[in-house]
Amino acid sequence: MAAYVDSARAFFADVRLLGNQDTLFCAPLPEKEREKDGFLGPRGLAPRRPTAQYYRHCQIAGDIDFIFGGADALFEQCTIRTVNNHLPVSYVTAPSGRADGLGFVFWDCDFVSDDCPAGTVFLGRPWRPTGKTAVLDCRLGAHIAPEGFSPWQSRTDSDLACFAEAGSTGEGAAARGAWVKQLDGQQAEELLRCARKLCRSE
């Protein structure tokens, strides 16, 4: 883990966060663990508190769920790099936020890889049923899977999650399944406005 971020507000600019699995923990943890003693670490037994995080011009690298947690977070003009550790499948995000939260919002970012095979990297999967990730006006490399997003292993409650996309370009941009919400221009603009207001205090 390169960074554990657990404060009411956080701002990172021009920072490189490099790792493999679980590079950036955008706290808080989910309310409940799935396995006994599954939460070990800071604030594992403390009440959960909402956090708003803002990342600008950052490079974040990893392979499995390398941006994860329950924060409301905005990533602006960042480079999101999947490391090629010769895994059959990789995942960028694993959100676990509240149903009424914002989740992770990526705007004008570059999703690149270290020569990962085409179609082997998912933009995200829900760590908890209400996880959310939105990808807006981003450039996606060929490593991004055509489906875009994935359920969490064999769980059947992923229909509560919200994965959204608008304005994607590049070899990894594709027609997604019905599970991924396609936002129109007005919806994407409103989501970005809300994210900036919450995470940048605009």
List each language-model region with its residue ranges.
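Sequence-level preference for short, compositionally simple segments enriched
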Residues: 1-202
